[in-house]
Amino acid sequence: MNRFDFWLVMKNPEHGRVVDNLGLCVIVTPEELIDLPSLMVAPMTTSREDLPSRVECDFEGSKGYIMVDQIRAVEKSSFIKKLGELEIDVQVTLCDCLQEFFAL
């Protein structure tokens, strides 16, 4: 598991909202903290919304959006399968978005 990996994450049936039932996510935990029992992830969506907290990317030939405004911690036991890695240019854009989103 590494920062910027796409992972399929086990859906949580206890939550009713679609965003809460994770699915495809991107790991955003810094590499220095990757050995912790839970990781920070940003879920993906195919719904386009003009929000500054959404980062556009391509996944398996389809356009998607990383939802920085929906970041949450997920236990490693919920990670099902690695599906790929973000392209370098999208990694840079995501880091810029994270810095802006969490600016104090």
Where do the model's predicted regions map?
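Conserved functional hotspots at enzyme active or ligand-binding sites that engage polyanionic ligands
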Residues: 1-104
